[in-house]
């Protein structure tokens, strides 16, 4: 049985992750953290009834992780929180699933160093949906044959998402850029200027959109659109739980969803 701890357990993603953890026959929830609602049952927020696991103050992360004997910590919070909490967990010997987006290169370096020092296993991905990771594979292949086409990425999310562009859009841009030998990124368009070899990246924040991503390859007289639409956050929670089961069987190191899915 895998002992799982969840950060941000009272939030939209965290509560879905709790729900999926308790529905797994190979996992049990042993700790749940947030910045408020201390002492309340984690099952209350996941709407699954009482679980006997109270919400703990994230300030007590290291102590609770050790006392609960957590094997893996799942973190879908915010960049400023993850850069503090992930190193604490790694140095406590707890494996990590990180779905936080908006990490700067400097923050990512801090996290990577802590994982290496702690000799734990971690999956770090901007998107845990199986479909999105297949989408990544498809656009990589398409870009190899369409390097002379104009390439644009359009993403849309709900109006509460703080970071823009999305981590998924940035990962898509990196995949395409690597496939075509490098391109400059342009975020939105404004003014009058010549265009070079670039990838345009455009973000929309509106309503309750779960997550839409479109990659547009446009040539003369034709265009190809490759699209992924998320209808529910459940796909991210299910993918994170799948990754947590997988990572606990791996040697220490930093992995991606490509590794989890064998893509």
From Swiss-Prot:
PANTHER family: 4-HYDROXY-TETRAHYDRODIPICOLINATE REDUCTASE 1, CHLOROPLASTIC-RELATED, DIHYDRODIPICOLINATE REDUCTASE. Belongs to the DapB family. HAMAP family: DapB. It is found in: Cytoplasm. The gene is dapB. Its main location: cytoplasm. This is 4-hydroxy-tetrahydrodipicolinate reductase. Gene3D superfamilies: Dihydrodipicolinate Reductase, domain 2 (3.30.360.10), NAD(P)-binding Rossmann-like Domain (3.40.50.720). NAD(+) binds at residues 8-13, 34, 99-101, 125-128. It comes from the Archaea. Catalyzes the conversion of 4-hydroxy-tetrahydrodipicolinate (HTPA) to tetrahydrodipicolinate. Keywords: Amino-acid biosynthesis, Cytoplasm, Diaminopimelate biosynthesis, Lysine biosynthesis, NAD, NADP, Oxidoreductase. Its EC number is 1.17.1.8. One of its GO terms (biological process) is lysine biosynthetic process via diaminopimelate. The active site is at residues 157, 161. It comes from Methanosarcina barkeri (strain Fusaro / DSM 804). (S)-2,3,4,5-tetrahydrodipicolinate binds at residues 158, 167-168. GO terms for molecular function: 4-hydroxy-tetrahydrodipicolinate reductase; NAD binding; NADP binding; oxidoreductase activity, acting on CH or CH2 groups, NAD or NADP as acceptor. GO terms for cellular component: cytoplasm.
